[in-house]
UniProtKB/Swiss-Prot annotation:
Keywords: Cell membrane, Cell projection, Disulfide bond, G-protein coupled receptor, Glycoprotein, Membrane, Receptor, Signal, Synapse, Transducer, Transmembrane, Transmembrane helix
Gene: Grm2
Family in the record: Belongs to the G-protein coupled receptor 3 family.
InterPro entries noted in UniProt: ANF_lig-bd_rcpt, GPCR_3, GPCR_3_9-Cys_dom, GPCR_3_9-Cys_sf, GPCR_3_C, GPCR_3_CS, GPCR_3_mGluR2, GPCR_3_mtglu_rcpt
Annotated source species: Rattus norvegicus
Protein name: Metabotropic glutamate receptor 2
The organism's taxonomic lineage, starting at the top: Eukaryota, Metazoa, Chordata, Craniata, Vertebrata
Molecular-function annotations in GO: calcium channel regulator activity; group II metabotropic glutamate receptor activity; scaffold protein binding
Length: 872
């Protein structure tokens, strides 16, 4: 199989040599020869292989290899007694041309087997070649990833180790395909990771990408998109730039980027020449982007020359390196007369100084007289040459321990063993490194260098000049100093935005379509919801409310009326005044307990009635107090009881009057159960009915407190008694019955003469009470959603009910007692009853305990008896 591959390669070689024109080759004699592959020329157009001379990536890198070889050959400690030679070719920045050139590296191997043995012809003789070159021990190069991939596929067939100084495609880490390839630079996925971290650092989540055709751009942008997706960064549009695109085609790429106005950041994974053309097209179209560019752009002045305005604000990445001052001195000392070994140097000299050797006007120029910019990967070229030299040095020590020259074990060098045992295991301090730099050259198990990057921004300096400014680095993590970035400084205002959708507010969540992570609609959470995550609102639950940051919930404080609230001040003031007034009336009645007015009023029922009124006022304090089990029990017990005390006394009083006047139709016989003791007993019996109802209510629905939240006002948690408002109605139903009966009796006695005013006052009291209750009950149930209004309504209504009784029944009596004492005497009118002597007898009987006597009068068209205190 290997002989067949060698034969096919030989045919390809002979065909290329026979048909191709003479080519330039840099050859240095040596005991061991290292191949070199550099983009001395830029890629040409459709009609030519090669373009103009590439000063930085071509000439400088090539001279860096020669510089390193000179130093190694003069080093007595590195390969002593062994001289390294070189066989350097021009790739013209094209993979196809590089593959043709690389056939030179394998020509010497075509006459030997993979293990170094010579091929035997069918007739038994050894194969010979008239111009067979010295065998290449290893190759330094190439620059571009697609070039290295093509060359690596060829070199692996002949087990020739290859160390690249600039190829960063992640494909080259695949040791199953590129098992003789190593590099002093890291693969692109480290760079892609650094670029993705930069985007996430500035919160750029929606970007466009541009990649150069070929392995460098395509695999690089694939690695970037993978890292971007892991960080929820989306790509709005992806564009490619080709090798032979026109200016109009580059402008078309810029217009395609402009079609995504939300993606203000464009990520470039392009070659330097493609980046240069893209910037020029951007400037021609007067467009503007924030560029994040790979090391293809790096910190090269040639990329931004003439397009400074379009490049301003760009963030670029470059492999971490340092300039080699010795190389700068070496390169600036070169001229066409002392550097004749480089066959391309005269061509470079002519283009650099715009002179011609034919006209003999090039001698006056010097590289020392012009600005010098050391290409960023010079360090990696030198490290690659030194890595190969150290590997050969270690191999020589292992295989040729007793000689400083090459022994038979290294004639020829076994490429497989050189790569597997020595190149991959090499480790040494980087040559020419600054004293304060800790830089070690070594390879990982994939043959890759260690990933370290410098990060630059391109900014306008003083006097309108532009320059690159280092703003950070990446070494397994991002470190940025934004103070050097003009648009990222605090005084520059908000950062440039590059996102599909604006960030949602604190109380909003994202609503995205399946598969989308960067474009969304913002949906507000309900006031009672918190943000479970950026996509979900979650209900806090009744009694809880989201915190200020909407990251969780807290338990709402329990609301209840406090003594200092405005809702409490009014009812409490009314209740205090009413209670004082009640106590005042009670005191007056006790003081004048034996007077006719007090006696005629029915002293016992009056005191019971005053007790009920006082309870009504006291209920305000019970309802304003903080709900507790004891308070809730008092509310149930006290409200209905206070009313029942009042209305039981009034019902007993009106019933007595009605029975007294109703009995006149059958004679002046004294009605039953109208004595004070009977009246008190009847009143207490009526009150006990209410107490039984309340007791049953307390048993069926045990008192306690509970938290209540209205659906329309979930932010308010009310501490309330646990009874239902409907059950309150059942408790008050009994009092409604008492009021109805009182009102009925008051209505029946409405036509009693003016000299019997007690019935009229009771009637007026009951009519007013009915109005209050008719207004109170609807208001109480309608305002159930607002505990403050409901409680205040309850307190005021109860106090009004007591005030009506106090004002309508006791105020007239109080007026006579205090201001008209002359009327507070017994009247001695003569009886005029048609019942004759019966009246005095009845009067005597009815007057017991009340000091009154019956006198005939007319009520509802009938003759009835009247109290002696008729003026009440």
């Amino acid at each position: 199989m290997e002989s067949l591959l060698g034969f096919l390669a030989l045919l390809l070689l002979w065909g290329a040599v026979a048909e191709g024109p003479a080519k330039k080759v840099l050859t240095l004699e040596g005991d061991l020869v290292l191949g070199g592959l550099f983009p001395v020329h830029q890629k040409g157009g459709p009609a030519e292989e090669c373009g103009p001379v590439n000063e930085h990536r071509g000439i400088q890198r090539l001279e860096a290899m020669l510089f390193a070889l000179d130093r190694i050959n003069r080093d007595p400690h590195l390969l002593p007694g062994v001289r390294l030679g070189a066989h350097i070719l021009d790739s013209c920045s094209k993979d196809t041309h590089a593959l043709e050139q690389a056939l030179d590296f394998v020509r010497a191997s075509l006459s030997r087997g993979a293990d170094g043995s010579r091929h035997i012809c069918p007739d038994g003789s050894y194969a010979t070649h008239s111009d067979a070159p010295t065998a290449v021990t290893g190759v330094i190069g190439g620059s571009y990833s697609d070039v290295s991939i093509q060359v690596a596929n060829l070199l692996r067939l002949f087990q020739i180790p290859q160390i690249s100084y600039a190829s960063t495609s992640a494909k080259l880490s695949d040791k199953s395909r590129y098992d003789y390839f190593a590099r002093t630079v890291p693969p692109d996925f480290f760079q892609a990771k650094a670029m993705a971290e930069i985007l996430r650092f500035f919160n750029w989540t929606y970007v466009s990408t541009v990649a150069s055709e070929g392995d460098y751009g395509e695999t690089g942008i694939e690695a970037f998109e993978l890292e971007a997706r892991a960080r929820n960064i989306c790509v709005a549009t992806s564009e490619k730039v080709g090798r032979a695109m026109s200016r109009a085609a580059f402008e078309g790429v810029v217009r395609a980027l402009l079609q995504k106005p939300s993606a203000r950041v464009a990520v470039l994974f392009t070659r330097s020449e493609d980046a240069r053309e893209l910037l020029a097209a951007t400037q021609r179209l007067n467009a503007s982007f924030t560029w994040v560019a790979s090391d293809g752009w790096g910190a090269l002045e040639s990329v931004v020359a003439g397009s400074e305005r379009a490049a301003e604000g760009a963030i670029t990445i470059e492999l971490a390196s340092y300039p080699i001052s010795d190389f700068a001195s070496y390169f600036q000392s070169l001229d066409p007369w002392n550097n004749s070994r480089n066959p391309w140097f005269r061509e470079f000299w002519e283009e650099r100084f715009h002179c011609s050797f034919r006209q003999r006007d090039c001698a006056a120029h010097s590289l020392r007289a012009v600005p010098f910019e050391q290409e960023s990967k010079i360090m990696f070229v030198v490290n690659a040459v030194y890595a190969m030299a150290h590997a050969l040095h270690n191999m020589h020590r292992a295989l040729c321990p007793n000689t400083t020259h090459l022994c038979d074990a290294m004639r020829p060098v076994n490429g497989r063993r050189l790569y597997k045992d020595f190149v991959l295991n090499v480790k040494f301090d980087a040559p020419f490194r600054p004293a304060d730099t800790d830089d070690e050259v070594r390879f990982d198990r994939f043959g890759d260098g260690i990933g370290r990057y410098n990060i630059f921004t391109y900014l306008r300096a003083g006097s309108g000049r532009y320059r690159y400014q280092k703003v950070g680095y990446w070494a397994e993590g991002l470190t940025l100093d934004t103070s050097f970035i003009p648009w990222a400084s605090p005084s520059a205002g908000p950062l440039p935005a590059s996102r599909c959708s604006e960030p949602c507010l604190q109380n909003e969540v994202k609503s995205v379509q399946p598969g989308e992570v960067c474009c969304w609609l913002c949906i507000p959470c309900q006031p009672y919801e918190y943000r479970l995550d950026e996509f979900t609102c979650a209900d806090c639950g009744l009694g809880y409310w989201p915190n200020a940051s909407l990251t969780g919930c807290f338990e709402l404080p329990q609301e209840y009326i406090r003594w200092g609230d405005a809702w409490a001040v009014g009812p409490v003031t009314i209740a205090c005044l009413g209670a004082l007034a009640t106590l005042f009336v009670l005191g007056v009645f006790v003081r004048h307990n034996a007077t006719p007015v007090v006696k005629a009023s029915g002293r016992e029922l009056c005191y019971i009635l005053l007790g009920g009124v006082f309870l009504c006022y006291c209920m305000t304090f019970v309802f304003i107090a903080k709900p507790s089990t004891a308070v809730c029990t008092l509310r149930r017990l006290g409200l209905g009881t206070a009313f029942s005390v009042c209305y039981s006394a009034l019902l007993t009083k009106t019933n007595r009057i009605a029975r007294i006047f109703g009995g006149a139709r059958e004679g002046a016989q004294r009605p039953r159960f109208i004595s004070p003791a009977s009246q008190v007993a009847i009143c207490l019996a009526l009150i006990s009915g209410q107490l039984l109802i309340v007791a049953a209510w307390l048993v069926v629905e045990a008192p306690g407190t509970g938290k209540e939240t209205a659906p329309e006002r979930r932010e308010v948690v009310t501490l309330r008694c646990n009874h239902r408002d409907a059950s309150m109605l059942g408790s008050l139903a009994y009092n409604v019955l008492l009021i109805a009966l009182c009102t009925l009796y008051a209505f029946k006695t409405r036509k009693c003469p003016e000299n019997f005013n007690e019935a009229k006052f009771i009637g007026f009291t009951m009519y007013t009470t009915c109005i209050i209750w008719l207004a109170f009950l609807p208001i109480f149930y309608v305002t159930s959603s607002d505990y403050r209004v409901q409680t205040t309504t309850m307190c005021v209504s109860v106090s009004l009910s007591g005030s009506v009784v106090l004002g309508c029944l006791f105020a007239p009596k109080l007026h006579i007692i205090l201001f008209q004492p002359q009327k507070n005497v017994v009247s001695h009118r003569a009886p005029t009853s048609r019942f004759g002597s019966a009246a005095p007898r009845a009067s005597a009987n009815l007057g017991q305990g009340s000091g009154s006597q019956f006198v005939p009068t007319v009520c509802n068209g009938r003759e009835v008896v009247d109290s002696t205190t008729s003026s009440l």
